[in-house]
């Protein structure tokens, strides 16, 4: 990797650069959870993992409602990744569960309609589902809508003055590249479909090339990366799930993205 600047900043995306509204549906009860916290849900469900589909939005939205999710993934050769998982989850179970699963695309279309109605200026639409290794089935499906935080552009622009800027996220590349383009982040510096271990490895790899590597995130799947970074900044908002072990992993805790600029500038001058 050729570095052009002395330092690197890695941003999570959803919840960090993008304000999210998540809609999650239980396939067991039919309950629809508005403004859901999927990482909290998974952390309280041993053996569960959040799977994100990396498919073009138009392709998903134009699917026949009665088409099976499993057939869609297989026939369209849709990549997917594990964004976050609780203890006891086995990624090898995903394909096995899909062999007999009867989840239909209409569930995603319905939750998507609800998710994108929350904001006027949507830039982010994510589709995913939760697999339970212990129950051997898909337990929830989810869709999210998101818009850039108002100060995201200013924070990233300030970081770019002294740092190479990266995005590392569990979400799909289509959404991440759209955000990167809006914020002036190089497409080559976008890494999607990351779980917590992959994020940590990204930090460790960057530390081979930069004297200082900073991680900015907000969720449980950022914990390992925050801990590994030379400086870890956690954004802990009142409506976000922030357990104690996540706070312990960070060097600084803020409640607004905009506070990161001053912390970055001060740290880089040390």
Predicted feature locations:
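Hydrophobic/aromatic ligand-binding patch that stacks against planar heteroaromatic rings
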Residues: 157, 179, 205, 224-225, ...
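Short acidic-hydrophobic, aromatic-tinged amphipathic segments that line or gate anion-handling sites
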Residues: 188-195, 251-259
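Acidic, Mg2+-coordinating phosphoryl-transfer loop and its flanking beta/alpha structural elements
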Residues: 165-173, 210-252
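Structural motif corresponding to alpha-helix initiation and N-cap regions
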Residues: 149, 196-200, 219
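Short, charged, surface-exposed secondary-structure boundary motifs
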Residues: 198-204, 242-251, 263-266
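Alpha-helical substrate-recognition element adjacent to the catalytic core
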Residues: 2-182, 189
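Short hydrophobic/aromatic-enriched beta-strand-loop microsegments
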Residues: 185-194, 232-237
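Donor nucleotide-activated moiety binding/catalytic core segment of transferases
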Residues: 192-212
């Amino acid at each position: 990797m050729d570095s052009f600047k002395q330092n690197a900043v890695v941003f999570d995306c959803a919840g960090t650069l993008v304000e999210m509204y998540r809609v999650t549906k239980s396939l067991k009860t039919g309950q629809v959870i508005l403004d859901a916290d999927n990482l909290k849900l998974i952390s309280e469900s041993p053996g569960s993992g959040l799977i994100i589909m990396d498919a073009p939005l138009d392709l998903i939205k134009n699917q026949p409602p009665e088409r099976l999710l499993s057939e869609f993934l297989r026939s369209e050769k849709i990549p997917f990744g594990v964004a976050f998982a609780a203890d006891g989850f086995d990624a090898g179970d995903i394909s096995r569960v899909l062999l007999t699963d009867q989840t239909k695309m209409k569930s995603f279309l319905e939750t998507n309609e609800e998710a994108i109605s929350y904001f006027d200026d949507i830039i982010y639409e994510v589709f995913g589902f939760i697999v339970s290794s212990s129950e051997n089935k898909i337990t929830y499906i989810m869709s999210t809508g998101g818009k850039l935080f108002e100060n995201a552009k200013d924070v990233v622009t300030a970081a770019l003055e002294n740092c190479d800027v990266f995005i590392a996220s569990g979400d799909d590349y289509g959404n991440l590249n759209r955000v990167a383009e809006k914020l002036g982040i190089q497409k080559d510096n976008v890494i999607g479909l990351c779980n917590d271990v992959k994020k940590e490895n990204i930090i460790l790899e960057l530390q081979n090339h930069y004297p200082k590597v900073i991680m900015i995130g907000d969720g449980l799947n950022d914990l390992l990366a925050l801990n590994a970074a030379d400086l870890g900044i956690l954004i802990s908002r009142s409506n976000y799930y922030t357990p104690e072990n996540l706070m312990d992993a960070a060097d600084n805790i803020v409640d607004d993205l905009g506070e990161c600029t001053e912390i970055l500038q001060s740290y880089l001058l040390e």
